Amino acid sequence: MSGVKLGSFALSISYTCVFVNLRRKKPIMAMYRLGHQQQHVPNTDISIFRDKVPYTPTVDDAALNKLIMIIRETYGLPKYTIRLISGTTFWAVIKNIYDNDRVFGNTTSEMMNGLDLVYAIDDFCTKQLLEMFPEHVTDMQHLAGAMSKSLGRTGFYRHLTETFKRHMLWSVLTNFSPVAYYPAADIARADEACDLVTRATVDRLRKTEETVLADERFRGLLGPEMVARLLKVIPGIPPDTARSIGLVFDNIRPKLSTEAARTLGGMLIETLRRQYSGYLPVAPLVDLTETVMVYVHEVDTCLLMDKRGRVFRALGEPISRSQPLSSPVARTSESTMKFQALFDDYMRAASMNAKRTVVTAPQTVAAQESRNPFTRELDSGQLSRATFENLIQLTGQLNYHQRTAIAESSGLVANPTMVSPTNTALAHMLRTNGAAIQESMLDDLNSRINDLTDQSRRFTDLKRVIGLLQSRDFETLAVHVGELHPDDRELVLHALGPSTRSAAQIDPPEIHRLPENTKLLCSFTTSINLPEIEELLHLWTITWETVFCGRNLFTRRKHALQYTTTGRHDNEPSQSIQFMFVDSLNAPGVLMDRLYPSKVTKLTFTELMVLSEKVETVTLPEIFAAQIGLNPSEVRLKNRDACEPPREIVTGVNHELGVDGRFRVAMEDV
């Protein structure tokens, strides 16, 4: 127990040294904590610009005023030139893309689905341990797996995945990536943590820690037999994790020298303390509504304040005073807006086609005169010569009594302009036969009304039957089908067959009776070609993947057969995005070199063969499998020929490199 106490005392000394060192200088986040401000505010000259136009903050700009106060208190310069990034035209463009472009969000989610942090950290730990202890491949792989898999129980990978997603979004949206650090013990409430520290604080912490661990007096206290017990006193480490890794170390320790065991034990303590009791990076939630982002030209620093009042320093390339604000998303916004407009046109056309819409307009038709020529000329009081001759012929066909009546009817003319005897006779004849003419017209009108009534009844009955057919009320439908016109009944019975077999409910057709003399302007009867929509969405997605990946992906072709590969991911984010995040992650010492490991071998084939001669034969499959990304069971050894030298080992691995930089493996049965 004395060894454990000495080790714990040494660890506590390192913690004390670190925290004493942290108090010497107050970083941005330590100087300002949600409303706590220093009393002394130096007099400074501050120039604020929004879209290259001078801007004066108002009382409503509470977050901006708070951020300006922090800048003045932190740097203490006599003059500041602050450039607003939020609230500008540039900010409106990227906000529109982030809020409305669904393909942008889908591309981000797809990249996150391909992220394998467990493998990335496991692969890095394995490589590091194998480089330190190449003769103990199996034991080092076991130890690396235990270290990486234990992190999944605390939400470590879930937090890093969400943080990397935010980092990637901020990078492509604004060209800056805000990041801060918070204690790993508070991993469950990263978005609520207010005790944030800067990168400089984390760097000083790690430097002090490395100094303590490298001290010979500390290493002298760190005996190999004490490592398993010292792991249990690391703050924040789960007991099961400390016990399982301690058991693995105790099994490996007898195979190592004392100095090698001490080195391995110190590395385990250092790594696990950083993972469970150190600091982890955190990125703010991507909120383009309440977030305030500014750039200070005097110190070339971009600062961000989220809606909780937390301050983040954003990483990115410096921008000059005359340089316009830009980002990968802003540069691509014009193209994606065209994609969106074209997609909306496709969907609108498909919707109109599904309704079978036609556009009509009333057709102008000349009104037909219902009066006969005799009546028109009689009403106007003027008779043409042709009408006059017809009347003479008509009066010649009258009998004696009719001619006598006409001769005696000169005083019956109603129109005083009709003074001729012929006109007078015509007027008397029309009045005499008015009753017969009226009766004939009434019969014709009744006939037309009956026809229209019959058509209206047919339409009403047909519409009622269609509604019953749509609601699948077949009992009532059978009653009303017999009331239909024979032609309509045949039509309904023809449509009743497929309707009864289909269980799907479709919208009832909208039937509109158009007035007579309607002209058809246009109709939408052509169907939308599905491959056109697929190609549009494909190009849209490739555009955003090109933005995220930083390389041209338009040469990639779609094939009927899609093959998966363990090599380089086609849609992995650009190396600049990955390296910036890995750098911020490794600042406190969390082991990872890449997020998307390509499994490209680091050793040449000759180096592998030299290494294989120094280890046992049973470990050869594990060596080659670890280097080329296969399972050990997939690598088989050939039988050694008697004529071959005893030290030469030939495997079934062809040392030619494939197109993705990996070894091509030829599997041969023993």
From Swiss-Prot:
Superkingdom of the organism of origin: Viruses
Protein name: Uncharacterized protein ORF37
Gene name of the record: ORF37
